Amino acid sequence: MERIKNNIFFNLSNTMLKIIGLVCMTIDHLYLYVFANTTVNVSIFRIVGRIAAPLFLFAVIQAMRYSSDKKSYIFRLYKYHICICILEIVLSYLLHSEISFNVIPEWLFTAIYIYLIDMIIKKEHIIRHIVLMLIPILVGIGSLIIGTSGSVINVFLPNIFTIQYSPFFLILGIGWYYMKKKKNQIVALIFF
């Protein structure tokens, strides 16, 4: 397993970070779906689960940093988003309740904005990339005005303003990407 260069997490591989995130997320969901309606108070499960999101975000940032084909990676994230949205729709229909567990838009938007900012920094088609940065914001505003939140439209055009962890999570990811030093990444994690 190849170690990620300059990793702030004790020189763990990206795969190990994902496995740790998966275990933490599973513990969180175990509480959410098994113990939530009982008198058992094991909120430590929820606390452990909060570790997963920053770990997955860090894995996405590392993928964007070291990927040879960033567009392909972004497109894969988009395909995963669509698949999970379809699964949500099917489960909501079968269980007769609204189910929402798709956190991939946070990572998708983070990857998109990292790519666009990189293109602007490289001075490649600056105006085009600035316009492309505005499109998710304008689509999100339009979606909020029209009231399409939770509709099939969001399967193909996720709303940047209704992502589960808020746009600040996206800003944290972009900040992490451009902060090369370990100390700066840790400070950003603490304050966001």
Question: What label would you give each PLM region?
Answer:
Residues 1-192:
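Alpha-helical transmembrane segments and their immediate juxtamembrane cytosolic regions
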